């Protein structure tokens, strides 16, 4: 497949939501289906490829460039490794804490990969991106017109939904100039009350779909302890099949939309409606009250 025809997707989500775990398990399932895949990790934790490679952390492009003095002194084989089902794996890396911008590492890595032929003979390139905030750096795959399909990993928890709405706002900012579209919300379950209904409602408000609900299963943690995807660790498990279903949905997805992010007040109203957040009236009764003093509401 020519570079022009490669589908470039990105997984965004707040820290701790299970974004990297969800993306790697889904991409492993896609690779099982014969898709040729390159993962570009864009998270400073450099954990976007560890399950594919059975490793703690891959050497990053930015770290090696700093050691050598320039990215031109790196060989592609040093930073692009092959993992489960021949998935190609790269970590862009990030700056030292408090110094520089994450976007520098991301765009340096992407340019280096393109210039050295890493995007040849691929069906998908996947960017795994931190999404607590969509600052200029972490929005780089969108800003530069690389990622065209965005999938947001979220859950029925308030901060995960808040981050999802912020990410949708970032997608909207570049939708008309770069052609990026929102492919859907992936609900990585936290077993909160009415979680499926809540995320489906949020998806409609954002003009997108809940593309899949991934149930919570301890087998995911068992696989992670072994630095493996569920599809490799327990290929016959129900959870592995869930990732295969999600993988097929992404492969077949034509529902790519310009998102309609909502205001904070509307998000809070939605959370109140589903019992995630207390109403102002109830909150006023609770603020400053100890466990023994607080009224039951």
From Swiss-Prot:
Enzyme class: oxidoreductase
Binding sites annotated in the UniProt record for [4Fe-4S] cluster: 101, 135
Alphabetical keyword list: 4Fe-4S, ADP-ribosylation, ATP-binding, Iron, Iron-sulfur, Metal-binding, Nitrogen fixation, Nucleotide-binding, Oxidoreductase
Catalysis: reaction(s): N2 + 8 reduced [2Fe-2S]-[ferredoxin] + 16 ATP + 16 H2O = H2 + 8 oxidized [2Fe-2S]-[ferredoxin] + 2 NH4(+) + 16 ADP + 16 phosphate + 6 H(+)
Required co-factors: [4Fe-4S] cluster
EC number, as in UniProt: 1.18.6.1
InterPro entries per the UniProt record, alphabetical: NifH/chlL_CS, NifH/frxC, Nitrogenase_Fe_NifH, P-loop_NTPase
Key word ATP-binding present: yes
Modifications after synthesis and translation: The reversible ADP-ribosylation of Arg-104 inactivates the nitrogenase reductase and regulates nitrogenase activity.
GO terms under biological process: nitrogen fixation
Highest taxon listed in the record's lineage: Bacteria
UniProt subunit comment: Homodimer.
Protein name according to UniProt: Nitrogenase iron protein
């Amino acid at each position: 497949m020519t570079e022009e025809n490669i589908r470039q997707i990105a997984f965004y989500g707040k820290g701790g939501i299970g974004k990297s775990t969800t993306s790697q398990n889904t991409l492993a399932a896609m690779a099982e289906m014969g898709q040729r895949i390159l993962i570009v990790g864009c998270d400073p934790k450099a954990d976007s490829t560890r399950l594919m490679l059975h490793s703690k952390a891959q050497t990053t492009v930015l770290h090696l460039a700093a050691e050598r003095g320039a990215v031109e002194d790196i060989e592609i084989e040093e930073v692009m490794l092959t993992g489960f089902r021949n998935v190609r794996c790269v970590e862009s890396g990030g700056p030292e804490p408090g110094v520089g911008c994450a976007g520098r590492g991301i765009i340096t890595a992407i340019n280096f990969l393109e210039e050295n032929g890493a995007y040849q003979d691929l069906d998908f390139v996947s960017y795994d991106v931190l999404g607590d905030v969509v600052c200029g750096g972490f929005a780089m795959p969108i800003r530069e017109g690389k990622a065209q399909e965005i999938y947001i990993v979220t859950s029925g928890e308030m901060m995960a939904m808040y981050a999802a709405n912020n990410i949708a706002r970032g997608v909207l900012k570049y939708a008309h100039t770069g052609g990026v579209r929102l492919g859907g919300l992936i609900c990585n379950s936290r077993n909160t009350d009415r979680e499926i209904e809540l995320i489906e409602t949020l998806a409609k408000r954002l003009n997108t779909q809940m593309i899949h609900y991934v149930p919570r299963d301890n087998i995911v943690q068992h696989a992670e302890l072994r630095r493996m995807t569920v599809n490799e660790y327990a290929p016959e498990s129900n959870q592995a099949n869930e990732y295969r279903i999600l993988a097929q949905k992404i492969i077949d997805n034509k529902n790519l939309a310009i998102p309609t992010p909502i205001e904070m007040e509307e998000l809070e109203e939605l959370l109140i409606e589903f019992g995630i957040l207390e109403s102002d009236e109830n909150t006023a009764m609770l603020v400053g009250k100890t466990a023994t003093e607080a009224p039951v509401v």
